[in-house]
Swiss-Prot record:
SMART domains assigned to the protein according to its UniProt record, in alphabetical order: YqgFc
Cited InterPro entries: RNaseH-like_sf, YqgF, YqgF/RNaseH-like_dom, YqgF/RNaseH-like_dom_sf
GO molecular function, one term: nuclease activity
Main localization (coarse): cytoplasm
One GO process term, biological-process aspect: rRNA 5'-end processing
A GO cellular component annotation in the UniProt record: cytosol
Domain of life from the UniProt record: Bacteria
Protein name: Putative pre-16S rRNA nuclease
Keywords, comma-separated and alphabetical: Cytoplasm, Hydrolase, Nuclease, Ribosome biogenesis
EC numbers for this chain: 3.1.-.-
């Protein structure tokens, strides 16, 4: 099922399984995974997109190999909070995953995640060219970590 509300998503996640974070792009997808305790988001990879079918198959392999039970995808709202064309593409992509693999997905506001990823790389003295290669997975980590932090608050 697709959730736009983290509060509802938290109620349905399997806490014994890991959570995958995705920073969706038209050319690349940044991927992060939670640790086994669902406390920390860890960078996994940047997947270069090929075709919808191949993309879904590759993601499926990753979530089977890593015991993933749910997914968080960055929701690319405009700075004003308005949905844009990329938001529609994210929803279509998420619905394809749900239809094919019956997994719960949460769309989470990703405003500023790419800017924060770029800033973190700069602070770490990573060259711009190297930074561009990892920005997507850093963004995926930031998106996923925000949701993991919300889950922690609910568990207190």
């Amino acid at each position: 099922m697709l959730y736009k509300n983290v509060d509802e998503f938290i109620k349905v996640i399997d806490k014994t399984k890991r959570i995958m974070g995705l920073d969706f792009g038209e050319k690349k997808i940044g991927i992060a995974l939670s640790d086994r305790t669902n406390l920390i988001a860890i960078p996994y990879s940047v997947y270069v997109r090929r075709s919808s079918r191949k993309d879904l198959g590759s993601l499926y392999s990753i979530f089977v190999e890593n015991d993933v039970g749910s997914i968080v995808i960055g929701w690319p709202l405009e700075l004003s909070g308005v949905e844009n064309e990329l938001c529609q593409k994210v929803v279509m992509f998420a619905n394809r995953i749900i239809t094919r693999y019956k997994i719960n997905i949460c769309l989470h506001d990703e405003r500023y995640s790419t800017a924060m990823a770029t800033r973190l790389a700069k602070l770490a003295n990573i060259k711009r060219k190297e930074s561009q290669a990892i920005d997507d997975k850093i963004s995926a980590v930031l998106i996923l970590q925000q949701v993991l932090d919300i889950i922690k608050v609910y568990q207190m």
